[in-house]
């Protein structure tokens, strides 16, 4: 976390307006211990602490964290439990012809399905929250 704080401080001291800055969590290099087989291991709690400490928007990159279509979808759904301000998801009409990151590119159909699932989860969560308040 100190590393993130130092980077934010350094960038802001260089004259960047805070309103033009956001943070992006892409996970951390897994090293040897990688039980989920992700390309990078996410630390969602750390990302939320940094969002709170810096008061900057925090987005999440499930594409580079997951490393494969199946894992991108899975980790995007996991990230939905946190208050990220957005997601960076690589989408290509023909992933096999993508110029980079071929294995983690979703098709438009997969992307639409993921968004629908995330939307349904959010609606269900809001409904449950409203019921609890009644």
Regions inferred by a protein language model and the residue ranges of each:
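Catalytic alpha/beta core domains of metabolic enzymes, predominantly
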Residues: 1-91
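C-terminal helical cap(s) of enzyme catalytic domains, especially alpha/beta-barrels
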Residues: 93-127
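Divalent-metal-activated hydrolytic enzyme cores
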Residues: 127-134
């Amino acid at each position: 976390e100190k590393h993130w704080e130092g980077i934010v401080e350094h960038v802001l001291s260089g004259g960047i307006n805070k309103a033009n800055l956001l943070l992006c969590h892409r996970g951390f290099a897994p090293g040897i211990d990688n039980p989920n087989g992700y390309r990078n291991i996410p630390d969602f709690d750390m990302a939320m602490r940094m969002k709170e400490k810096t008061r900057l928007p925090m987005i999440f990159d499930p594409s580079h964290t997951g490393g494969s279509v199946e894992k991108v979808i899975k980790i995007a759904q996991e990230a939905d439990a946190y208050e990220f301000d957005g997601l960076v998801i690589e989408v290509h009409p023909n992933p096999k012809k993508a110029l980079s990151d071929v294995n983690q590119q979703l098709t438009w159909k997969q992307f639409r399905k993921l968004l629908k699932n995330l939307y349904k989860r959010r609606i269900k969560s809001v409904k449950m929250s409203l019921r609890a308040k009644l």
